[in-house]
Curated annotation (Swiss-Prot):
Residues 1-19 form the signal peptide. Its main location: secreted. Belongs to the conotoxin O2 superfamily. One of its GO terms (molecular function) is toxin activity. This is Conotoxin Bt6.6. Keywords: Cleavage on pair of basic residues, Disulfide bond, Knottin, Neurotoxin, Secreted, Signal, Toxin. It comes from the Eukaryota.
């Protein structure tokens, strides 16, 4: 009887551990989906004024939609 009780206790601990791990994995997957769906296309970023288009004055690469600031002007992809 004692062995059966211990066996049931171990089984309960293993099942609850598995449930915790599975729940954490689902949360990570959902966070990944949310992150990827929140990204905007280059056209959307340009339209909303979050980046500069081609041949516009710039100082840094990150200012341009193309990501290329050459000689103070945004490059065309």
């Amino acid at each position: 009887m004692e062995k059966l009780t211990i066996l049931l206790l171990v089984a309960a601990v293993l099942m609850s551990t598995q449930a915790l791990i599975q729940s954490d994995g689902e949360k990570r997957q959902q966070a990944k989906i949310n992150f990827l769906s929140x990204r905007k296309s280059t056209a959307e970023s340009w339209w909303e004024g979050e980046c500069k288009g081609w041949s516009v004055y710039c100082s840094w690469d990150w200012e341009c939609c193309s990501g290329e600031c050459t000689r103070y002007y945004c490059e065309l992809w």
